[in-house]
């Protein structure tokens, strides 16, 4: 049956409703987006397909579609190309190109590109190190995100950076409040996101938070395990009425974490790979009935 724009758009909607897309679903999704790109020349579809390839770590193809959209002056494509070159996804990092694309996007109000541009000033990538410039940019983004409700708004990324600035300035109370908000935003985002970088963000937020406040097991949530599972312990977890035991321990001088008869080398591998009923553990955040330390 020949594709139409309406049918192709329906394929996209149906694909995003799938819990576990199969190979055939992926092919149909790709074909639909390629059709929409050909028929509409809409850069939004180009970035959408580029983003899918990026998530699959097929970075060469992601770059191709981002460049296609950038030629149409699509601001989100500039941001995405900044990531490609900043992290060296298609070779070595190219900070000159990264700065170029982040600057293009930032100048058009893209907040993600703005905080990445700030990072380049902080680290001295392509530009001279300029920490005051970094602080100025990050602080300027804070009012733009106050009142944000979309879990994919860059609240965790900006607030966690601003929290570190406040710690340096001696304002730990404000830093703690920012980290608590960032943690809740990122926890909610992970219910819906399978992007490989989102777990790294929540990990650093949790560790930064517990460098400022004392951990209290009575108020523990799922992502506090990034802090708890760094040393030997035993926990009980209930998700949707089913009990699980999580244990971090040493055996023959080797540290590992176990849950549901599976072992993990460290807390990063645990969060990346632990599954419950074929769903990632981290996506079960809202289904946790209780989580407690055991003796």
Predicted regions and their residues:
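TPR repeat positional signature
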Residues: 4, 8-11, 33, 46, ...
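Short coil/turn and helix-start
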Residues: 20-24, 55-60, 71, 89-93, ...
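TPR/TPR-like (Sel1-like) alpha-helical repeat modules
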Residues: 134-144, 173-189
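Short helix-capping/linker turns of helical repeat alpha-solenoids
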Residues: 40-43, 72-75, 87-89, 108-110, ...
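Hydrophobic face of amphipathic alpha-helices that form TPR/SEL1-like repeat modules
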Residues: 14, 48-55, 80-87, 116-123, ...
């Amino acid at each position: 049956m020949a594709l139409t724009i309406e049918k192709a758009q329906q394929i996209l909607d149906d694909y995003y409703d799938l819990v576990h897309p199969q190979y055939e679903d992926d092919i149909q999704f790709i074909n639909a987006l390629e059709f929409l790109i050909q028929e509409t020349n809409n850069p939004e579809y180009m970035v959408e397909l580029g983003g899918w390839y990026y998530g699959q770590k097929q970075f060469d193809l992601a770059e191709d579609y981002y460049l296609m959209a950038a030629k149409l002056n699509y601001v989100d494509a500039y941001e995405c190309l900044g990531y490609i070159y900043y992290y060296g996804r298609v070779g070595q990092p190219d900070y000159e190109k990264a700065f170029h694309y982040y600057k293009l996007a930032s100048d058009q109000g893209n907040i993600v590109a703005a905080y990445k541009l700030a990072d380049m000033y902080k680290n001295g990538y392509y530009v001279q190190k300029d920490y005051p410039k970094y602080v100025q940019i990050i602080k300027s983004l804070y009012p733009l995100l106050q009142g944000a409700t979309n879990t994919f708004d860059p609240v965790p990324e900006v607030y966690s950076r601003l929290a570190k600035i406040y710690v340096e300035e001696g304002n730990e109370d404000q830093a703690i409040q920012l980290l608590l908000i960032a943690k809740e935003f990122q926890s909610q985002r992970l219910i819906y996101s399978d992007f490989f970088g989102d777990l790294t963000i929540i990990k650093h937020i949790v560790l930064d938070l517990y460098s400022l406040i004392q951990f209290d097991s009575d108020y523990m949530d799922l992502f506090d395990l990034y802090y708890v599972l760094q040393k030997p312990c035993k926990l009980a977890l209930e998700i949707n009425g089913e009990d699980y035991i999580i244990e971090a321990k040493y055996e023959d001088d080797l540290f590992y974490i176990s849950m549901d008869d599976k072992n993990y080398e460290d807390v990063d591998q645990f969060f990346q790979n632990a599954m419950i009923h074929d769903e990632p553990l981290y996506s079960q955040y809202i289904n946790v009935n209780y989580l407690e330390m055991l003796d």
